[in-house]
Amino acid sequence: MISVKGLTKSYGSTDAVRDLSFSVDRGEVVGFLGPNGAGKSTTMKILCGYLPADAGEVSIAGFDIFSQSLKARSRIGYLPENVPLYPEMRVGEYLAYRAALKGVRSRRVAEKVEDALQLCNLGHVQRQIIGTLSKGYRQRVGLADALVNEPDILILDEPTIGLDPGQIREVRSLIKGLATRHTILLSSHILSEVEMTCSRVLILNKGQIVATGTPAELRESSGLSLSGAVRLEVQVPDADATLKALPELPHVASASLVGRTGEWSTYEIIPSAGDPRPALFEEAVRRGWKLRELSARESSLEEVFTSFVTGGAAQVSLSEESRS
C-alpha cells in the first residue's frame, strides 16, 4: 500500500531524509519511531503530498504521490501532530464540510459523517462546539476527519500526544479497531504505546532507517532480548553441583545460588549473547528436575530503540521472508 524508494529531502545544507526506502503492506499497523529531528514528520508530510521531495519515489495504493497527487491523496487519511480544527464549528458540521472538501458525493456526506462519528465514538457530541471539547475529544475529531472519506491508508503523526493516560487508552483501542479496515502508519514518542498497537516498527535516525521488524525481532537483533538476570527455581538433589553445571549450558555467562527453601533452590543466571531459557528448560527435563520458576524480564522497546539510535546495535533490515 505504501512504497518509498530512495527518498531524499534537504532544508538548505541539512538533510532531513537521506535515501530512505521502506514499504508498508495492506493491513499492517506500522510504528514509525525516531528521536526529534530524525525525519519522521518530514517523511509523513511527503507521503501525504504536503511537501515535495528532492529525489526518490513514493507510491500510495499504486499511485505516484508526485505525478498522480490527487488520486494518491484521496487514498490517505492524515492526522497531523497538531490537528487544525475550526473551534467555532460544531463537530458534525465540521466533518460534513471536510467530507465535501475530500470529494465525498453530496448524497453520501451524511452517511459518511455518521460512520466516522460512530467509529470514533463521537455521536453524543456531534452538535457540540469543537472549541469546548477536551484535548482527547478534539483528537478524536481529527481522527474522524481522517476517516470520513473511507481512505485505504491512515497516516497518524503522534496520535496520543498531550493526552492523559485514560485518553491514551481510548485512542489506542480506537486505532486497534481501525486496523481491521485500514493500513496504518503512525509515529509516536510513547514507545510502550507503539509496542501495544503496532505489528511492525521502523526506527529512523538522522534521516535513515536503522532497523525494521517486529518488537521481538528488534530485541533479538539488538542483542537486548533479555534485560537483566534469569531466575531459575528448581528442586534438585545437589544444589552445589547444579550451580557448577549451569554455566556449561548455551547462553549462560554465569550463575549464582541466591536462595534455598526446603528442597527448592533458586539460581540467578546472567545471560551471554542469546536467551538461555530454552537450554535451561531442556536441562531440567533431561535431569528430571521439578521446575517452579523460569523467568526473565524482556528488554523494553525503549531500551531497544536507544540501542539503535545511539549506535549500540548494528543497522538491521529484516528480509521479507523473516516478516512473513
Question: What function would you assign to each model-found segment?
Answer:
Residues N121, V252-V258, K290-S295:
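A short linear hydrophobic-aromatic micro-motif
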Residues E114, T132, T261-G262, S299:
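Positions that flank functional sites
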Residues G77, G103, G142, E220-L224, ...:
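A generic structural signal for secondary-structure junctions
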Residues S272-S324:
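C-terminal coupling/interaction segments
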Residues I2-V4, K9-K206, V210-A211:
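ABC transporter nucleotide-binding domains
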Residues R172-S272:
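ABC transporter nucleotide-binding domain
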